[in-house]
């Protein structure tokens, strides 16, 4: 009626005004269906006018033009304004910090979880949400509305195990003891089949994020590239990459640095070590002079390992541990340049020398790590809720995935995109496996 009254001229303001003038409200699911309903009505209006033209030539050109123009403007519907004006649950949601400070995708996760929970319990959305917000207080609302279920994980491992055992038993009956050579390939094939099936059955929920403008700047983040330094042109490329990362992720709460080691050798120090350290320090000083005091250098001394070789202690793992200790007032590396206050660093983002950090990639990780639902909760020294480490999805570039046969096997050819969206452990169990590249909460 609103569209007919306005001559099929559509706008968010006229729609809200029509509903509020009649004292009508909408449920969450009805708001999501609103765009499709309006689209259907406008298409029917165009069809009616075309039918009138065909029958007696008395169709309204103005109404048809208005309906077509409204169809073109339909994507401009401000869904958040509609929610705020017409949906009673939005007022309750805005009292929850994780929802109020979240981005649009995060708000959709909350709303869709409420829709499913209300349908499952057969309760009114407002009554259910009001009770849930009182129960959670300042805690995790989403954990109450949509608690993580371990049923998909149980079904996955049960079905894959039964299928693998059945195939192995059949192979043993057919080929006897020779089938033992096929046990590992069979299990790998079954797990791959299980990943393929469950990636289409189990819905992957996007991580909850804060809006970028809601990120607290008092908790700073240090982005470091862990690498070996050799001097010369090889090191120049690493510092150029560090500069690119800064330009792609310029933010007042981000700091950048190099976490380096010297190459392995049989002596604690080589003649060229001082030149390598001096070259690295000059690069850091140049970046600080050009972009402000936002760059640091952490270059460790060699230590002797059990094999009698001198090198960085425990390589990358040891480098990260030593850096966290230094950030918290511990022993500093041999070559140390840090013009900013290290005590303000709350997060450490570790990257490899061959890792790409996309535009605003660090900010996206931070927005997920700082969301109230994702903040880690400790019990007896272990994280029992939330996350202490955030690891971004690893995407293999198509050019790299087909460069060698080994890379083709590792990227699984056509699975380049699926592997970035579905993860067996994270999707089914709610936790992942850290591979060394990610955001670490160093305050734990």
Regions of interest found by a model, annotated:
Residues 1-155, 207-444:
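Internal catalytic domains of large membrane-associated glycosyltransferases
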Residues 149-195, 392-393:
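Alpha-helical bilayer-embedded segments of polytopic membrane proteins, i.e.
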């Amino acid at each position: 009626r609103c569209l007919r009254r306005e001559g099929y001229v559509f706008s968010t303001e006229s729609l809200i005004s029509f509903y509020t003038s009649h004292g009508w409200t909408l449920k969450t699911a009805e708001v999501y269906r609103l765009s499709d309903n309006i689209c259907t009505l406008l298409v029917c209006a165009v069809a009616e006018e075309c039918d009138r033209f065909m029958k007696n030539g008395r169709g309204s050109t103005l109404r048809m033009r208005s309906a077509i123009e409204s169809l073109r403007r339909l994507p401009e519907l401000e869904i958040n304004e509609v929610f705020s004006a017409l949906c009673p649950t939005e007022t309750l949601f805005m009292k929850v910090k994780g929802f109020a400070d979240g981005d649009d995708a995060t708000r959709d996760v909350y709303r869709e979880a409420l829709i499913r929970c209300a349908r499952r319990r057969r309760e009114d959305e407002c009554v259910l949400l009001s009770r849930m917000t009182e129960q959670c207080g300042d805690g995790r609302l989403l954990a109450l509305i949509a608690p993580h279920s371990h049923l998909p994980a149980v079904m996955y491992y049960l079905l894959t195990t039964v299928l693998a055992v059945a195939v192995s038993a059949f192979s043993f009956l057919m080929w006897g003891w020779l089938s033992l050579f096929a046990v590992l390939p069979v299990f790998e094939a079954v797990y791959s089949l299980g990943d393929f099936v469950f990636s289409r059955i189990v819905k992957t929920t996007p991580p909850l994020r804060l809006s970028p403008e809601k990120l607290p700047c008092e908790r700073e983040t240090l982005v470091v590239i862990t690498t070996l330094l050799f001097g010369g042109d090889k090191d120049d490329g690493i510092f150029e990459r560090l500069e690119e990362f800064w330009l792609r992720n310029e933010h007042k709460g981000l700091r950048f640095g190099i976490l380096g080691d010297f190459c392995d050798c049989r002596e604690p120090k080589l003649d060229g070590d001082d030149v390598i350290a001096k070259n690295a320090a000059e690069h850091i000083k140049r970046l600080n002079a050009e972009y402000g005091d936002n760059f640091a250098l952490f270059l460790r001394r060699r230590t002797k390992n059990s094999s009698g070789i001198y090198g960085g202690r425990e390589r990358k793992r040891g480098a990260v541990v030593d850096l966290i200790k230094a950030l918290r007032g511990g022993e500093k590396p041999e070559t140390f340049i840090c013009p900013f206050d290290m005590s303000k660093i709350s997060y450490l983002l570790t990257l490899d020398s061959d890792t790409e950090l996309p535009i605003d990639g660090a900010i996206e990780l931070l927005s997920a790590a700082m969301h109230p639902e994702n903040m880690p909760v400790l019990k007896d020294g272990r994280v029992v809720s939330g996350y202490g480490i955030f690891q971004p999805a690893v995407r293999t570039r198509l050019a790299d995935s087909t460069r060698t046969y080994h890379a083709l096997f590792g990227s699984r050819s056509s699975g380049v995109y699926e592997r970035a969206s579905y993860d067996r452990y994270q999707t089914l169990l709610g936790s992942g496996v850290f591979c060394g590249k990610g955001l670490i909460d160093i305050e734990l």
